[in-house]
């Protein structure tokens, strides 16, 4: 969860904090966590495969995790993070509302889609990180750093320092993200729901 799950866990916590601040002036926080982890590339069936398409050299860390978060207002979030997924990094967020659905394709960002029957068509052109082949449908970012929000994050940090305010990705978000991930590991190890003290 720490290596791959911190981004989606942080994203859902950020959205609930923002919702709470807009509705009542205080963030909606995570109340409990249920989680599980696994090392799917270490199971015998995968180890027996002669050709391995998935990254499998990780040591002392899971390559699959899932966490169910329950928030103070009773809403839920299901977060999965994994390396055992062909086609590169996937960071997808779906919010199901009582009056709509919001689908966010953080990565792959689908603003640009390209196709080639053979990866050699693209030559040395960079497509995206952690993709095992350039063949088939691909989702390159016209400006990967901008599309992933790195300049915007830095701009907010500089503005926060200049204006004397907390950045959008501030200390409470960082603290709660780490707290939820740690609680997730405790849940996975002990096989139980972990309640967070508030």
Q: What function would you assign to each model-found segment?
A:
Residues 30-32, 92, 101, 193:
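A residue-level signal for beta-strand positions that form part of recognition/binding surfaces
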Residues 50, 97-99, 124-125, 188-197:
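Juxtamembrane/interface motifs at transmembrane-helix termini
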Residues 37, 55-65, 71-152:
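NAD(P)-dinucleotide binding in Rossmann-like oxidoreductases
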Residues 2-10, 148-155, 172-179:
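A structural signal for well-ordered alpha-helical segments within the folded catalytic domains
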Residues 1-76, 81-88, 172:
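Rossmann-like dinucleotide-binding domain that binds NAD(P)(H)
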Residues 72, 143-145, 156-198:
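C-terminal helix-rich "cap/oligomerization" subdomain common to oxidoreductases
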């Amino acid at each position: 969860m720490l290596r791959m799950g911190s981004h989606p866990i942080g994203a859902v916590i950020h959205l609930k904090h923002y919702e709470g601040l807009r509705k009542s002036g205080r963030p909606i926080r995570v109340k409990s966590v249920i989680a599980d982890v696994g090392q799917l590339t270490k199971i015998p069936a995968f180890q027996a495969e002669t050709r391995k398409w998935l990254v499998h050299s990780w040591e002392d860390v899971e390559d699959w995790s899932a966490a169910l978060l329950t928030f103070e207002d009773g809403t839920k979030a299901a977060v999965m993070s994994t390396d055992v997924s062909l086609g590169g990094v996937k960071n997808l967020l779906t919010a199901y509302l009582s009056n709509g659905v919001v689908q966010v394709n953080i990565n792959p960002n689908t603003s640009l889609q390209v196709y080639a029957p053979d990866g050699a068509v693209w030559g040395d052109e960079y497509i995206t990180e952690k993709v095992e082949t350039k063949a088939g449908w691909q989702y390159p970012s016209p400006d990967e750093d901008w599309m992933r929000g790195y300049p915007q994050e830095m701009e907010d940090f500089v503005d926060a320092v200049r204006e004397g305010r907390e950045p959008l990705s501030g200390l409470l978000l960082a603290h709660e993200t780490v707290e939820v991930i740690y609680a997730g590991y405790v849940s996975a190890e002990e096989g139980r729901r972990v309640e967070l003290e508030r």
